């Protein structure tokens, strides 16, 4: 019974495709708008019909699931591209909030193991870790300078300070790589080493993402007032990365 119903739905969908093509060639409507709206509705209809019978993963096609996810992703990108500044703030705020939840999960795991396994820690050379913090602090100062230059539409100075901010990010990643190469323990040796690599490695990935954001915003910046200071979301993201590093410094090195 299930197979006959699915065969009938496939037959209906094939008929719908031919009806769509015939209507397209007979009416002569605008090509892009017509194809976009027609096939978007067809994909939604196709997935909804088949998901009625997809009660288990056995009857759910991977292709249908992929097409549905792709349609949602494309529509979300289009909505973001045509949204106002307040909507962009809300989207970016939720993105940063989700990142905070990710770091909070691993920090809570570290706290749980740290409190349940009291250990005697050796003295550390704190100055080396504070130097890494100074690098990110310098980057935050550059972000504040960039915001002032964006308000003044200073094209050359803004591009120069964005390049310096990228250089700061590379210096931080270089120092982090030196720390990994000189560490005397490995991932599987001890739980503290595992969480150290997870937290600092995840933070380094976010530094790379911040550098990519700066590159994107520097590409779209024209220096004629077309990009307002409230749209410089890369600065907000960089401050978020710095605050995470301060929390990790207090947690891993000073506590």
Swiss-Prot record:
CDD domains reported for this sequence:
Heme_Cu_Oxidase_III_like
Q: Provide the family line.
A: Belongs to the cytochrome c oxidase subunit 3 family.
Query: Gene symbol?
Result: MT-CO3
One annotated GO molecular function is: cytochrome-c oxidase activity
Its transmembrane ranges are 12-32, 42-62, 91-111, 128-148, 155-175, 196-216, 234-254
Q: Which PANTHER family match?
A: CYTOCHROME C OXIDASE SUBUNIT 3, CYTOCHROME C OXIDASE SUBUNIT III
GO BP annotation list: aerobic electron transport chain
Class of the enzyme per the UniProt entry, highest EC level: translocase
Q: What does this protein do?
A: Component of the cytochrome c oxidase, the last enzyme in the mitochondrial electron transport chain which drives oxidative phosphorylation. The respiratory chain contains 3 multisubunit complexes succinate dehydrogenase (complex II, CII), ubiquinol-cytochrome c oxidoreductase (cytochrome b-c1 complex, complex III, CIII) and cytochrome c oxidase (complex IV, CIV), that cooperate to transfer electrons derived from NADH and succinate to molecular oxygen, creating an electrochemical gradient over the inner membrane that drives transmembrane transport and the ATP synthase.
Q: How does this chain assemble? A: Component of the cytochrome c oxidase (complex IV, CIV), a multisubunit enzyme composed of a catalytic core of 3 subunits and several supernumerary subunits. The complex exists as a monomer or a dimer and forms supercomplexes (SCs) in the inner mitochondrial membrane with ubiquinol-cytochrome c oxidoreductase (cytochrome b-c1 complex, complex III, CIII).
Q: Please give, as recorded in its UniProt entry, the membrane topology of this protein.
A: Multi-pass membrane protein
Q: Is Iron-sulfur set as a keyword in this record?
A: no
Which domain of life does the protein's organism represent?
Eukaryota
Question: What is this protein called in UniProt?
Answer: Cytochrome c oxidase subunit 3
Q: What is its EC number?
A: 7.1.1.9
Pfam families xref list: COX3
Which catalytic reaction applies to this protein? 4 Fe(II)-[cytochrome c] + O2 + 8 H(+)(in) = 4 Fe(III)-[cytochrome c] + 2 H2O + 4 H(+)(out)
The UniProt keywords, alphabetically, are: Membrane, Mitochondrion, Mitochondrion inner membrane, Translocase, Transmembrane, Transmembrane helix
Name its cellular compartments.
Answer: Mitochondrion inner membrane
């Amino acid at each position: 019974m299930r197979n006959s119903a699915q065969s009938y739905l496939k037959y209906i969908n094939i008929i719908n495709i031919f009806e769509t093509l015939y209507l397209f060639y007979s009416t002569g409507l605008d090509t892009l708008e017509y194809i976009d709206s027609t096939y978007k509705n067809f994909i939604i209809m196709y997935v909804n019909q088949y998901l009625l019978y997809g009660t288990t993963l056995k009857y759910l096609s991977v292709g249908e699931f992929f097409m549905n996810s792709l349609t949602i992703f494309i529509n979300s990108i289009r909505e973001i591209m045509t949204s106002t500044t307040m909507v962009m703030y809300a989207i970016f705020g939720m993105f940063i909030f989700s990142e905070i939840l990710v770091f909070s999960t691993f920090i809570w795991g570290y706290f749980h193991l740290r409190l349940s396994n009291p250990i005697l820690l050796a003295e550390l050379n704190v100055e080396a870790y504070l130097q890494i913090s100074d690098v990110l602090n310098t980057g935050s100062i550059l972000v504040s300078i960039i915001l002032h230059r964006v308000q003044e539409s200073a094209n050359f100075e803004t591009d120069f300070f964005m390049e310096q901010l990228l250089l700061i990010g590379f210096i931080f990643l270089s120092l982090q790589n030196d720390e990994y190469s000189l560490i005397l323990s490995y991932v599987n040796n001890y739980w503290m080493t595992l969480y150290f690599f997870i937290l600092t490695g995840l933070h380094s990935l976010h530094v790379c993402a911040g550098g990519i954001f700066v590159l994107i915003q520097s590409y779209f910046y024209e220096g004629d007032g077309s990009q307002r200071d409230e749209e410089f979301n890369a600065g907000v993201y960089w401050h978020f990365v710095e605050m995470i590093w301060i929390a990790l410094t207090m947690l891993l090195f000073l506590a």
